[in-house]
């Protein structure tokens, strides 16, 4: 009705009628009414409950079924919530943080975190309250399916909540029975929890997980890169182990390592790491088969050629093989990176590369 004739609905007092329906004893009616009001009032910033209505819903929601409970909680937060109402909500709903249904717990946690965002003392208390709750769920063998949703939420949680989880870092070490989604979410979050004292343990744990599916492998290498670049004392250890993986089974790991090698910022190595980095690059290039490489891995190859061509035996041969590839589907970035890498090789080996450089320039002049 609203979408067809909004003006008529306003004239007939639809909004007022819907607000009165929020006192209906049936939870499903209340849920659908909230949703409808939110759509109708979208242009005005959506539904905003006054204190009286929020208190009424709070008194009723504690007896709702899980689905309606979670739905109504999404509407209990408002910029207009004062401290008295905030405390009322916190006190009334606190027991639901211990609810066995993860969706109920997470709905309450999300609401609480919004409510106390600008109240320092309440926020400190809430951090202490929700941390063991989150840890308990993540440690549970019966919550594996739900834990993906919890992990998704805490990926973007504020830093003080993350800090409180640092002492529980092992909870984020993936378990064999975890689903692939949960494994990836845990691995992606691990770098946020790592400090110097736990970095090496986290790195070794992730390395020992391998091999996994390609998605998990890439998540591992991306998180290793984040840890190795933030905790410099672990950088060499990470690079050496990546090289060992390539030497052990380059077919299994080359593409996955190439997908993440730029994240390791190996062009910014220190003098003490020089030998290990160069050996790592040589091992990558020795394992490389240009004819079978995925197009998405080429940017990493260009990166290595541009920064390490002086360490790669006959780099012009790699350039030549790449130029023989079908480039019809390449994005502009690939062409520019190929030109940049070829130029670096040309500066190093002008006699061996001048014909290739000329062909490339002619190709791009006619594109």
Feature-to-residue mapping (PLM):
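Extended alpha-solenoid helical-repeat scaffolds
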Residues: 1-367
């Amino acid at each position: 009705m609203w979408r067809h004739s909004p003006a008529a609905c306003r004239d007939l007092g639809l909004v007022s009628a819907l607000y009165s329906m929020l006192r209906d004893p049936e939870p499903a009616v209340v849920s659908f009414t909230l949703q409808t009001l939110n759509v109708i009032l979208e242009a005005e910033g959506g539904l905003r409950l006054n204190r009286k209505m929020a208190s009424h819903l709070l008194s009723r929601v504690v007896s709702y079924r899980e689905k309606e409970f979670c739905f109504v909680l999404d509407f209990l937060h408002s910029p207009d919530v004062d401290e008295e109402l905030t405390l009322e909500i916190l006190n009334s709903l606190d027991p639901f943080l211990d609810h066995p249904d993860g969706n109920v717990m997470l709905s309450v946690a999300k609401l609480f975190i919004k409510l106390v965002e600008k109240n320092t003392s309440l926020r400190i208390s809430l951090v202490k309250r929700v941390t063991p709750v989150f840890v308990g769920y993540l440690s549970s063998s019966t919550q594996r399916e739900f834990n993906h949703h919890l992990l998704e939420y805490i990926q973007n949680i504020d830093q003080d909540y993350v800090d409180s989880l640092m002492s529980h870092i092992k909870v984020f070490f993936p378990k064999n029975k975890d689903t692939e989604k949960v494994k990836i979410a845990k691995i992606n979050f691990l770098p946020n929890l790592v400090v110097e004292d736990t970095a090496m343990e986290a790195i070794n744990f992730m390395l020992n997980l391998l091999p996994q599916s390609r998605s998990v492998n890439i998540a591992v290498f991306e998180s290793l890169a984040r840890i190795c670049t933030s905790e410099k004392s672990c950088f060499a250890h990470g690079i050496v182990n990546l090289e060992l993986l390539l030497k052990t089974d380059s077919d299994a790991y080359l593409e996955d390592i190439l997908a993440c090698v730029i994240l390791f910022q190996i062009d910014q190595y220190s003098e003490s790491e020089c030998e290990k980095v160069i050996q790592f690059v040589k091992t990558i290039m020795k394992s490389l088969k240009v004819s079978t490489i995925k197009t998405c891995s080429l940017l990493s190859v260009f990166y290595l050629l541009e920064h390490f061509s002086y360490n790669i035996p006959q780099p012009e041969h790699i350039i030549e093989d790449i130029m023989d590839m079908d480039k019809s589907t390449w994005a502009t970035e690939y062409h520019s990176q190929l030109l940049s890498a070829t130029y670096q090789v040309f500066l190093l080996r002008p006699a061996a590369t001048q014909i290739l450089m000329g062909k490339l320039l002619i190709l791009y002049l006619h594109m």
